[in-house]
Each structure stands twice: as structure tokens, then as C-alpha cells.
Amino acid sequence: MTSFLSFSAISAHPPTFSGASFRPRSFSPRLFKSCVKCTYAEAGLSSASWSAPIDIVADVKSERVVVLGGNGFVGSAICKAAISNGIEVVSVSRSGRPNFEDSWLDQVTWVTGDVFYLNWDEVLLGATAVVSTIGGFGNEEQMKRINGEANVTAVNAAKDFGVPKFVLITVHDYNLPPFILSNGYFTGKRNAEAELLSKYPTSGVVLRPGFIYGKRKVNGIEVPLDLVGEPLDKIYDSAERFIRPLRSLPASDLILAPPVNVDDLALAVINAVKDDDFFGIFTIEQIKEAAAKMRA
């Protein structure tokens, strides 16, 4: 499941799109101009006897990503990966900067705010992509609001402002009984997906991980989820051909859906931000493929 940012004060139908798609998009990236001065000397003449400066102006792509829920388990991994890849990062969350220390934290702009009451004009200025990790649990209405309405609000704000790409982290398409899939957690996330893919049909990205593992910090204390997730991941990889047929059994995904390393999920997000042809819905396997592409 996605890491969840606590939106406690935050008082449809599933999308018809199936699978990832690839097609060039028409949006213009954020650019800045780089000027290089060169000298040129004619044949037979020394550079001292005749030379003239030539100004070369080149357009260079520069990414600026706004991460909603950037101080959470998944969000902080995304921020860290973005910084490592030379991407400017703005994090938006209700509690601001995380309460642990790391060298990359000072390179992120930490904004404290509620997605429903943000000054989007300030937050989205210059953004080339928005990444949302917003999600959480609670009662039925809270889950619809946190997982659905909060993300729908963010999608519409980004679209209205003209941000060219939006990446949404939701949840694996579990083969659970309908009465479970109809609760606010799942319906909220699917409603958010539908809104994203309708507003960003050729540049919206939906990543659907299952259990996410890694070293999670809770109130400054490290919780090593990788002690469980990493061995499971290796077992599932080695036994994939035996496990795959069993995944058609009702509710089998709860046990048999492969876990995802939080760093792999973060790299898949970076791939989505950098690759203009990367859009659509991405499964657990496709998330891992995108991460491998970034590591290659």
C-alpha cells in the first residue's frame, strides 16, 4: 500500500485505461538558456591574429518536481532520488520537514500545508511534474477524502496551472471480494486514478505497488520493513513461474503479490518524470522494470 500522510484534519467508477501506454506528448518542458562562448580562427591564421567570439545559446531541460506527502516513507525516498538525479524538489506536507537528519534534506524546499488549502500558484510555480503519495486509513468518509478527494484536488490544481505531468501512487489491483474493494480506501484511490487519466490522458502516470518495504522512520525511530520485504521479494522472484498460476485464486494477491522496494518505487517515479513517453497505469512488475531502467 502507499505510505500514508496523515490528513486527519481533512474533514466513481474505476478507470477504463488498462496497462501502461507510450506515445510522445506535446507539452513543452521547463527550459533555461545556457550561453557558451567560443572562438574561431580561419585556416592559416593564428588565433592571436584573428579570432571572433561566437555565442551559442542552447535550451537545456530542467525538472522541478512538487512531491505531495514528501516527508513520508515513500515521499522522502522520492525526494532523495530526485535530488540524486539533479531534479529540483519541493515537498508539501502537513508537518513540513522530517524530524530526522540527512545530507539531502537541505536541498529540498519544505512547504507546510494542507492540500485543500494550499496557495497552488506559489507551490506549482515552475513545476514540470507533481507527484502525489497522499493516502491513508480511517473511517469510510475519511478514506474517501484522503485517498480520493485530496488527490482529485491536486490533479485539478496542477492541470489548471499547466503542469505538464502528474504521477500518482495508488495501490495494487488486488483480487479481493467486491465488498472489500468497495470501501473508501480502494474507491477513493480508483476515483483519483480516473480523474488523473481523464485530465492527463497522455502524460498521467499511475503506479500501483503492493506492500512497500525499506527502512521506514517513525518519530525518528527506524523500522526495518526490509527485514520482511527483501527476503519475500527474493522468494517471489525465484518462484515466479510457480506462483503466477495461483494469483488467479480469489484474494491470493494478499499473500502472492510481490513486495516493492521503496527505492525501486522512487526510481520508477524519477523515470516517469524524466521520460516524456512514460504514461498510463503501471503494475508491480512494470514498476520494477522502470527502476531497473534507471539503474542501467
Curated annotation (Swiss-Prot):
<protein>
    <recommendedName>
        <fullName>Uncharacterized protein At1g32220, chloroplastic</fullName>
    </recommendedName>
</protein>
<keyword id="KW-0809">Transit peptide</keyword>
<dbReference type="GO" id="GO:0005634">
    <property type="term" value="C:nucleus"/>
</dbReference>
<dbReference type="GO" id="GO:0010287">
    <property type="term" value="C:plastoglobule"/>
</dbReference>
<dbReference type="GO" id="GO:0009507">
    <property type="term" value="C:chloroplast"/>
</dbReference>
<dbReference type="GO" id="GO:0009579">
    <property type="term" value="C:thylakoid"/>
</dbReference>
<comment type="similarity">
    <text>Belongs to the NAD(P)-dependent epimerase/dehydratase family.</text>
</comment>
<dbReference type="InterPro" id="IPR036291">
    <property type="entry name" value="NAD(P)-bd_dom_sf"/>
</dbReference>
<dbReference type="Pfam" id="PF13460">
    <property type="entry name" value="NAD_binding_10"/>
</dbReference>
<dbReference type="InterPro" id="IPR051207">
    <property type="entry name" value="ComplexI_NDUFA9_subunit"/>
</dbReference>
<dbReference type="InterPro" id="IPR016040">
    <property type="entry name" value="NAD(P)-bd_dom"/>
</dbReference>
<keyword id="KW-0150">Chloroplast</keyword>
<feature type="transit peptide" description="Chloroplast">
    <location>
        <begin position="1"/>
        <end position="57"/>
    </location>
</feature>
<dbReference type="GO" id="GO:0006979">
    <property type="term" value="P:response to oxidative stress"/>
</dbReference>
<keyword id="KW-0934">Plastid</keyword>
